[in-house]
Structure formats: C-alpha cells, structure tokens
Amino acid sequence: MGLSVSKLLNGLFGKKEMRILMVGLDAAGKTTILYKLKLGEIVTTIPTIGFNVETVEYKNISFTVWDVGGQDKIRPLWRHYFQNTQGIIFVVDSNDRERITEAREELQRMLSEDELRDALLLVFANKQDLPNAMNAAEITDKLGLHSLRQRSWYIQAACATSGDGLYEGLEWLSANLKRKSP
C-alpha cells in the first residue's frame, strides 16, 4: 500500500524528464546556450565535433540536452540522435542573414523525419544583442514556421551570453511537456 501511494505521489509531484536535441548551423551559439543554462556563466567554446550532453534542471523537469555540432560535414550525423527526442531546440544566429536559407533547409529536412514527428520545436533566435540581428518575426518568416501545421512550435528571441530569453524557452518546453504527458 505504502509503495503504491509513493508511486502515485511521485507520478504527480516527481521529477519529469525530457530529452532535448539542440541543433543549428555552426557558430549559432548552441554550446554557449547549453553551458549558460547548466553553469549560469559564459564558457569559451570551440567548434563542436561530435556532441556535448548536460542535464539542466528547471521547474521540476530534468532536461537532458544533447548539443550536436553544426558544421555541414557533420549534420548528417544529427539523425543518430533523433530516437526518443521529445523536444528540438533549433538555434539560429539572428545576425547571419547570408545563411538563414541554409538554416531553413536544415530545419525542414530534420522536421520531415518520422522519428521526430511528435517532438516539440523551440527556436532560439540567438544573438539578439547584435545591432543587425533579425527579430523573431523575421526569423519566423524566413524559416517558414507558420507553415508547420502538425507540430507545436515556439520562437524565442535570445542572447546566449547574457542569458536573455533562455529560461523563457525552457518555460515553454516545460509547459508543453506537461500538456503532452499522460
């Protein structure tokens, strides 16, 4: 009896877990975001060859965040991380107007994968502190987010170095994870 009550309470109040895949073009700020969330500070990063994985605790949810390198040569490896992914964080360098079309193509390619059909999509429009940065509405348009019909998505203006917008993004993920949970 006591065990079943504790199981019930744990189900109601226990820690939920969410597997997150964080991707985007190279130099978008994925690793900086990961360690700003994990450590609360800016770390010096080098281009990610392979992946970084960290657990980030937020509002009784344990987010396991897989930060996968974004160079064009290693993007085909992203698919190896798709299984059991509940949420995708797609990071865009808001200042990189030359590559926004490339970002859109990579995002659309990934979202067409069957293994990710139920995954939530959070887009971080990163580097909002730069003077020429595209705002969230412009990035929404350029990525074609309004055409996504069967997917929950959200775009959040962010600045990885200051932390602006990062927790608002996690807030959206946590609220929508709870909505999808049984």
Curated annotation (Swiss-Prot):
Question: Which InterPro entries does the protein's record reference?
Answer: Arf1-5-like, P-loop_NTPase, Small_GTP-bd, Small_GTPase_ARF, Small_GTPase_ARF/SAR
Pfam families assigned: Arf
Q: Which GO terms describe its biological process?
A: intracellular protein transport; vesicle-mediated transport
- What keywords were assigned to this record? ER-Golgi transport, Golgi apparatus, GTP-binding, Lipoprotein, Myristate, Nucleotide-binding, Protein transport, Transport
Amino acids binding GTP: 24-31, 67-71, 126-129
Subcellular location, principal: Golgi
Q: Where is the lipid attached (N-myristoyl glycine)?
A: G2
Q: GO molecular function of the protein, one example?
A: GTP binding
The coiled-coil regions, if any, are none
GO cellular component: a single term: plasma membrane
Superkingdom to which the source organism belongs: Eukaryota
Database matches in PROSITE patterns: ARF
Is Cell membrane set as a keyword in this record?
no
Where found in the cell? Answer: Golgi apparatus
Q: What is this protein's function per UniProt?
A: GTP-binding protein involved in protein trafficking; may modulate vesicle budding and uncoating within the Golgi apparatus.
Task: Name the protein family.
Answer: Belongs to the small GTPase superfamily. Arf family.
* Protein's recorded name: ADP-ribosylation factor
Originating species: Cryptococcus neoformans var. neoformans serotype D (strain JEC21 / ATCC MYA-565) (Filobasidiella neoformans)
What is the name of the gene encoding this protein? ARF
